[in-house]
Amino acid sequence: MTLEELRQSFADENHPANKNPERPDFFRELCQESRRIEMELNSVYHTPEEIVEIMSRLTRRKVDSTFRLFPPFTADFGKNIVFGKNVFVNAGCRFQDQGGITIGDGVLIGHNVVLATATHDLAPSKSRKLHYKPIVIRDNAWIGSNSVILQGVTVGEWSVVAAGAVVVRDVEPYTVVGGVPAKFIRKVDNDVEAGTPVDYFAGHI
């Protein structure tokens, strides 16, 4: 069984890989690998360059050199996350990524944000069964501290999720949402002309 087949199996409950007898052990091995890498990430100081290398190993995808993260950080699976360029992830974030998490360029993620791509079946007889849907955060969105984004949500470009929000449905581009559950608060005025470079970190991270 391959990693790509496993990723696809989370996206499609009818995927043939879900019936592969090797799947449970393969999944557990990859999760344990993630625990080891996360312990390495979170236990001692690392330079920004070292964190990029560690996160590339965790995700098994090349993470761009512009990526910045402040530990601690944990992911349930770790192998189904895609980071764009100039992404910043603040301390204490938790990613439940089995269903797939895609984070676009220039995204800012505050302290203690939870991205959860899984949910349990509501039927008591099936309550141990998990269902997965992806989370997509489009370019230049800002996710406020202590917010939670649930499975199947797409956060639009240049949108803002207020601190402490619980997002259960898609967020339109150029909007601010907040509350539990998150609701529309206001529009964001677009003051960036097309093609204008954005000074993401201004040298302070």
What residues fall within each predicted segment?
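Short, glycine/charged-enriched secondary-structure capping and boundary segments
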Residues: 124, 130, 175-176, 190-193
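Conserved catalytic-core motifs of eukaryotic protein kinase domains, centered on the activation segment
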Residues: 119-121, 125-128, 153, 187-188
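Terminal amphipathic alpha-helical/low-complexity segments used for targeting or macromolecular assembly
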Residues: 1-66, 182-186, 192-205
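Solvent-exposed, flexible loop/coil residues
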Residues: 45, 77-79, 99, 126, ...
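Generic detector of leucine side chains in alpha-helical contexts
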Residues: 3-6, 30, 39-41, 58, ...
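Left-handed beta-helix
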Residues: 65, 70-71, 76-79, 84-85, ...
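Generic anion/oxyanion-binding catalytic loop in active/binding sites
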Residues: 23, 126, 131, 148
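Generic preference for well-ordered secondary structure
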Residues: 18-21, 25, 39, 51, ...
